[in-house]
Amino acid sequence: MALSAAIILAAGEGTRMRSNKPKVLHTLAGKTFLNRVMDSVAALDPDTLAVVVHYQAERVAEAARSYNEHVTIVDQDDIPGTGRAVQCAMAQLTQKDDLDGAVLIAASDMPLLDTDTLDQLLAFHEKSGNGATVLTTILDDPTGYGRIIRDSEGNVLRIVEQKDANSSELAVREVNTSVYVFDAKLLAEAIANLKSNNAQGEFYLTDALEAAKANGAVALSPPPTR
């Protein structure tokens, strides 16, 4: 299917790594996390490849540009959250073009994310006729991850972050991988009115799934692998 844009989120500091280096610039087998994700995403041939930066923005932007001169750099402002990162990206990308197609969103700290997985996700999104699709997995220990909450028919109702989850939600082992596909126009509508009324005071991209459902779109994910 036509991939209008791919947005890689690389604005975070990565405080849990306790490093002066941005998390996405740490390396695996000689290549940065960011560059590995860029490789996997670029192989899908999106019309636009964007990288959102904030923490040590120039350093991360230079790493992205030196690796792929065609990348579009998006500066996230001081408003925190993945939802805000995508708001900034969409605002910049739609200044140039009227996006019409799919938009892939991926975190930059997933160096083992491969093109085949992304290709299958896009195919699932298209075949299912989804307005929004999220890649999930099941973990024995889901601590720290956003939990996938489904209805009785298996549709994704919402994603609840660890700090906002109640006891029953914390027991869910299916988690968000932070990889999504949205129809471009739906994404623009879904992120327009995100709120920060959560435990971390951030604009969550995960809330866009609930907004998508409110707009009549179906939010699904491929069947969990375990």
PLM regions and their residue ranges:
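Rossmann-like NAD(P)H-binding beta-loop-alpha module
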Residues: 137-168
